[in-house]
């Protein structure tokens, strides 16, 4: 499988990578990749929003039975079924819930790779208009020669401009960096 930038190499190692790879292969064989992605995304969103669920996932204090029972309740309430639900149950039964966020990230990497999508981290000083966002996507699509998924973040400390990370390449065209360069050049000129 092709690796897009440094993301796959670091994300697909260890336990998380093995679990994610097994899930991806099964989902692909059953033509359920998108359904599994949706279920995992829903669980991941719940995990980010709930301090109690985070405690359940991270704490070794809870027994396997308690974790499985709590996960069952969350899955039922969230309407997560099929392979995604079975995968989350398996992680709970094997005392691997603490690795689940990494497993979900690794699964997403595999899905993007299979679909020929690369991920780009984009930081801007202020939220972009839809037109600017489309322009950024089109430019990155041309550079990557692939479909691009944006991870957009607003960072007022940039003052202005943009910082883009695409795979192992990074372009910093922020006003903050330009001002720092000018400051260093002036200091060195003394």
From Swiss-Prot:
Pfam families: OSCP. Keywords: ATP synthesis, Cell inner membrane, Cell membrane, CF(1), Hydrogen ion transport, Ion transport, Membrane, Transport. InterPro entries: ATP_synth_OSCP/delta_N_sf (IPR026015), ATPase_OSCP/d_CS (IPR020781), ATPase_OSCP/dsu (IPR000711). It is a peripheral membrane protein. F-type ATPases have 2 components, F(1) - the catalytic core - and F(0) - the membrane proton channel. F(1) has five subunits: alpha(3), beta(3), gamma(1), delta(1), epsilon(1). F(0) has three main subunits: a(1), b(2) and c(10-14). The alpha and beta chains form an alternating ring which encloses part of the gamma chain. F(1) is attached to F(0) by a central stalk formed by the gamma and epsilon chains, while a peripheral stalk is formed by the delta and b chains. Belongs to the ATPase delta chain family. This is ATP synthase subunit delta. It comes from Methylobacterium sp. (strain 4-46).
